[in-house]
Amino acid sequence: MEPLDALEKHGDIKKVLTEKLATLPTSPGIYQFKNSAGRIIYVGKAKNLRNRVRSYFRNSHQLFGKTLVLVSHIDDLEVIITSSEVEALILENNLIKELKPRYNVNLKDDKTYPYLVITNEPYPRILFTRHRRNDGSIAFGPYTEARQLRSILDLIGSIFPVRSCKLRLTPDAIASGKYKVCLDYHIHKCKGACEGLQPEDEYRQMIDEIIKLLKGKTSALIRSLTENMHLAATELRFEQAAEIKAQIESLKRYAERQKVVAADMVDRDVFAIAAGEDDACGVIFKIREGKLLGSQRIYINNTNGESEASMQLRMLEKFYVESIEPVPDEILLQEALSEEEEETLRAFLLVKAKNEGQEKKGIRLVVPQIGDKAHLVGMCRQNARHHLEEYLIQKQKRGEAAREHFGLTALKELLHLPTLPQRIECFDNSHFQGTDYVSSMVCFEKGKTKKSDYRKFKIKTFEGSDDYAAMDEVLRRRYSGSLTESLALPDLIVVDGGKGQVNTAYKTLQELGVTIPVIGLAKRIEEIFTPHSSDPFNLPKTSPALKLLQQLRDEAHRFAITYHRKLRSDRTLQTELTTIAGIGEKTAFKLLEHFGSVESVAQASREELQAVIGAKAGETVYTFYRPEG
């Protein structure tokens, strides 16, 4: 996957999206793109939210037509995590039909996913339908594929002798003898209920078994079918075995049926909470007519060890006081309320419903432990955890930004700078007994590192140890010539050192005609030096200005030490190779650059060495490490 810092380089990605892209989960779910007005302009589903959403921006140069226009209007995004891609597909369909986003074109039609319905009759039928009934019939679904639903109907028909006729089998009609059995009875697909050959209670018992099957209690049935499949294969009835295998696969697919949409058509809210040390996030799923139409979030701060049950009650009260949505028939909760709390909340909701013209006899408050309702609460809690994590990351970044701003403001006031030091450059020297003398320059912009503007210098104008001369050389190279043209000038220069370093830096800058404030920060006791000041001054250890200066100084020191160690390592490694007759520094460097270490050079074959440095030199190095020939 392309890293986030690469995504940030694309010009078409807004800054507000960058942080959200960094926290996207890899779970399945739906994503909603919003425009600058906060309006949802597109809803999509994904098996992996992180990969799918990032693909819009990673490959933006390859987009065309409406998709390109869509991306140009994206200002924000929200996600809802689901348990499977199938759930995401159902939720996507529901949201598109409800919200009608501008850039959704594929699911705006009125096509409805099919349901399996058990009719409300003395001898119920099992039907395929795309329209829900409100006559007491029992519905299961929806199904994303009509083919899958038809295979389940075939499966049920192959296991249970359910009637397929459209006859109105009332007790009087059956008793009158007006109906006769059809072919299904003779091929054992029906038990002749139309002629009274199957009692109603026996038929009802069979329907109850089918309902159990449709509710997911399929393990025993699968075991039975598997035994039948093996028996058929053993008896060489391969066609029948294949049919049974297909039935098992259909049954297994059904076991993974959709749970986002509840079949009972009840209007309900689902509430769950996720809590951190000091913050908590509550998520409310809004389910209307069995469809999950969206979610809302509530955050509370400074929880101070408050229980999740207590926070849940606070959030529920806040949500329903402010909500303009109709009061649902049922609320699924993560934590149980006390009897008094439950009665208070229920009474408030009933009054609210009455004031809004709703007629409700009662409102169910349920803490489900198993089944589809528990699944909904679990999915809601998973979303709460995700949003809390995202919130805490944003909170941390806001805190860091505040500290950085305080640090810059404190520096401006402390040093009497004309403007806020948005860009600061810091220099540090490093050497070992006068050898491999180097210097580093690091850059902070708005209190954060800007590594693309880091520079490292190898001292060229003298040999030995002279920190002042090194500082003079580095500042001249930085603030004159090509670097002055390629890099913006800073608002403040910081050098690692005391009075001598600061005065040297000031003198060099004066000679170059550079009027940028410069200060020094000495190690150990953290004294701050300014040019021409006889005495340094100290800042409190908790000062945001001091912390920012320490970050700068430590980063410059780290960068210088890293470069210095690399030079020493390269020089040390080249020493052994350059002792080989006929091998100079350039050849040694080529070997190290290709093989990575002296050990790898020593173990290389003759052919490998010759491919890098030529036949003669390769033979020389190969023979050096294998004197025996």
Curated annotation (Swiss-Prot):
Keywords: Cytoplasm, DNA damage, DNA excision, DNA repair, Excision nuclease, SOS response. Residues 219-254 form the UVR domain. GO terms for molecular function: DNA binding; excinuclease ABC activity. GO terms for cellular component: cytoplasm; excinuclease repair complex. CDD domains: GIY-YIG_UvrC_Cho. GO terms for biological process: nucleotide-excision repair; SOS response. PROSITE patterns: GIY_YIG (PS50164), UVR (PS50151), UVRC (PS50165). The UvrABC repair system catalyzes the recognition and processing of DNA lesions. UvrC both incises the 5' and 3' sides of the lesion. The N-terminal half is responsible for the 3' incision and the C-terminal half is responsible for the 5' incision. PANTHER family: UVRABC SYSTEM PROTEIN C, UVRC/OXIDOREDUCTASE. Belongs to the UvrC family. This is UvrABC system protein C. The gene is uvrC.
